Amino acid sequence: MSKQVKLLFVCGAGLGSSFAAQMATEEVLNKNNIKAKLDHVDISTAASSNVDVIITAQNFQKQFEKFNIDSEKTSIIYLKNIVSEKEIEEKLIPVLKERKFLD
């Protein structure tokens, strides 16, 4: 990997589920030897964040569609199960390859 990926985990309050998703994603990153900067925030803060990938629960999709997030700069991954390492890996790895964070 040529550069460190910046991942942002988002939930309503920026505390519970976003932190749980962050912990599950750390396992996936470690397993795949991916270096990343991780943070978790509430949904209102996420709109103005400068990150490579936002990871959030599927139930926030309608709210994110209202934000003006540049898809060229930031990919958004919606999860059905925010603590499923399998789902995180299945959705995150292709995005990282597409965005040239992985070969």
Q: What residue ranges belong to the model's regions?
A:
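Structural signal for conserved beta-strand scaffold positions within catalytic alpha/beta enzyme cores
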Residues: H40, T56, I77-L79
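Conserved acidic residues
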Residues: D52
